Amino acid sequence: MGRTVVVGDIHGCYTELLELCDAVALHPDDLLVSVGDLVDRGPSPAEVVGFFRSRPNSVVVMGNHERKHVRGVLSYAQEITRLQLGAGYADAVAWMRTLPYFFENEHVRVVHAALVPGVPLDEQREEILCGSTSGEKALAGIVPTGHWHEHYTDPEPVAFGHHVTGREPLLRDGRVFGLDTGACHGWNLTALVLPGRTVHAVPAHADHWSVTRREWQLPVLRTRPWRDYTWPDLTAALSRTQDPWLDEVAAWAELLRSSLPALVAAAQALARELPDAALRAHPAAPVLFQARTGRLDEAALARRCVTPRRTLDLAAALGVPLPDLPGNQSSTP
């Protein structure tokens, strides 16, 4: 009968995962269990997900990072993973949706983040098991002092991740095993092998999260809805991050906002030239009617052109050439 091998938070560290499997001499008969957080922060989430999906005798517990993808709560790390997974992202998230919140066999209990001592696993709250923000708040109200595992007295061993314990795992009484040793931060990837309860680790090859953040900053920035931000929201988004490309975006936005006098002049000229029927059929008809009746000025146009896209669309309708978002080949004619 095979062993049970429980691996701490992998976070896209595929090379280290393979090395750890070699270090424990993983056999096809061994059950491989992940505490969750396969993805985010590391360089190879697609490979890690593919490894567990394709390997027989494998179990992945729902981590808070998988739960973020399942619920569509995408912050910077999740946006990077979405781009890394590319066309396979939706399929990967559909698979994540099927993950259990805990695992238990005759050797060990496995959760991602925490459990309430004394409560059966099938009665635990999912948000506590996976370590979501709401779950951590709820747990703090139930276990007000110390860490939950300091109050754990059940005879069954419990393995978990979520909270980085440092380069070394958290080991207590031969029953409590905290296995997140910061692989994505350049520390170690750790496994617990049962029934012997031995611990094995391999060092990370780099501070992967620092590297991944730098490498994917521009691709993530390019996915932002820059054309559809309101001007105040666009200004706020530009202020949050520094990147040379954002300097180009800021200059582009300023150019669009400064185009209002030219757009007013173009609308007034067109309103004078077009016959009534053509004006009514024109895509910029509301603006042209304002111009014809003398009610169009920069302030009135600014109330319409509240986003770059609306400004570009109006410019295209009026025949005023304006550049599209930097990095795009298209522009309004």
Briefly describe each language-model feature range.
Residues 136-139, 146-332:
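Acidic, His/Gly-rich catalytic cores of divalent-metal-dependent hydrolytic chemistry
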